[in-house]
Amino acid sequence: PPPGSGIPPAAYADYIGKTSAIAPGYRYDSRNDPFDPSRGRRFNFSTTIAGGPLGGNFSYVKPVGAATSYFRTGRKSHFAVNMEGGFIRAYDGKEIPIFERFRIGGDRSVRGFQYGSIYPLDGDDKAFFTEQGALLGGDKYLVFNAELVRAIAGPLKLVLFFDAGNAWLEGQSFNPFKLRASTGAELRMFLPIFQAPLRFIYGINLAPKTIKGPDGSPLNGGAEKSSDFQFSIG
C-alpha cells in the first residue's frame, strides 16, 4: 500500500545492510572569521553517490547544497541570510534508506521546532509511514534562515531570527507558501575554549499544527508546541 494508508505508527524500523558511497564536493569560503563571521560568503555543495558499481545494499544519489552571506549593518551589528536544500533519488530498483531521508527542525535548521519534527504531510496534516510503521522523511527539502546579530557586551551577542523550511515526498509539489516558519531571539556567546559559540535559543512556531497518524488520531499527544527553548554549542 502507499505510505500512510492503514499503517499503524511506530517509532523506529530496523534496517540491516551496507552502504558503499562516495561524496565529492566543492566549498568556497570568504568569511572574515570561521567561528564568528560578520562579513563574507560561504558556499558548499556535495553529492553522495551510493551503490551501483560501488556495491552495497542501497543505491541512491543525494545532492545537497547551502549558501550563506554576511553583511555589516553597523559597527556592532551584521545581517546574515542562508539558504540550503537537497534531494535524494534511488536507482537500480532500490528504495531510499529511511535514515537518509530529510527531516528538519532544531537549532541547525528551523529554530523553534524540535529536532527532526518537520517532515512531509498530506493536505490533511497526516504524516506518512512505511509499511513497517516508521515515520517517513522527505525526498527533498528546503531551509531559509535570516538573522540580525548585535553585539551587546564582550563576547555576548543578541540574535533576532526568522527561519522557514519544509520537506516533501517525490510526488508532492514545492509550495513556498506552505513552509513551516518560526521567529525568535537567541543569545550567542563565543568562548575561545570551545572554538564555537554557546547558543541559548527561544523560538516561536508561527503556525502550530496538529499532526495526525494514518488513522487520523493526533501524533505526539496533540498539537505542536507553540514555542521551544534550545541550547546548542556551535
Predicted segments with their positions:
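Strand-loop-strand
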Residues: 170, 175-185, 189-195
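Conserved short loop/turn motifs at secondary-structure junctions
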Residues: 50-51, 204-206
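C-terminal outer-membrane beta-barrel translocator/porin domains of Gram-negative envelope proteins
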Residues: 1-152, 160-164, 168-177, 211-224, ...
